[in-house]
Amino acid sequence: MNSAAPHGSSNWDPVGLGLVPMVVEQSGRGERAYDIYSRLLKERVIFLVGPVNDVTANLIVAQLLFLESENPDKDVYFYINSPGGSVSSGMAIYDTMQFIKPSVSTLCIGQAASMGSFLLAAGEKGKRFCLPNSRVMIHQPLGGFQGQASDIEIHAREILGIRAKLNEMLAKHTGQPIEQIEKDTDRDRFMSAADAVEYGIVDKVLTNRADS
């Protein structure tokens, strides 16, 4: 989790490259084409793929709020495949997940590292999943700052405060003692899908659709 780095977006832009599949649906009014992500949004499925930054956070927050307005009583399905990223951007997603009325079910595909694992754990208890070969990693927030000594000290205190807050929140969502969280996030802690269940980050490993 990078608390101080610029919130840039990835160079990978499948929409701009024209690589996103289109789905054509027939209706009494004729044909309508959707990109695959818009079509899945109709099924209340949203994605975090790639780094957590201001761009991805803005899109995810908007989708969460839209789905709440569509149906406040129906679950949202949040698929995560992310190496992590900005703490402030991740907190925007986290706070919105907790704020909206629908339950948010999280599912890790591929990896959920750093802020990605934090958001995975923040799903509705009993509705947090990962696929068998996914990987999860937790660690403390990263920060880098240059400037006068007094400014560096201010930023160091801020990062320590963020770390303590994130540890408290992760302890709440996983059920782990805060002392264990502090120890495990001191360095990169990698977990298999089964390890993530045991740790309390997710509730179940799904091997097929029937398991969900």
From Swiss-Prot:
UniProt GO MF annotations: ATP-dependent peptidase activity; ATPase binding; serine-type endopeptidase activity
UniProt keywords, alphabetically: Cytoplasm, Hydrolase, Protease, Serine protease
Protein's cellular compartments: Cytoplasm
Catalytic site: 114 (nucleophile), 139
Pfam families named in the record: CLP_protease
Broad enzyme group: hydrolase
Highest taxon, organism lineage: Bacteria
Family classification: Belongs to the peptidase S14 family.
Name of protein: ATP-dependent Clp protease proteolytic subunit
Organism name: Aromatoleum aromaticum (strain DSM 19018 / LMG 30748 / EbN1) (Azoarcus sp. (strain EbN1))
Phylogenetic classification of the source organism: Bacteria, Pseudomonadati, Pseudomonadota, Betaproteobacteria, Rhodocyclales
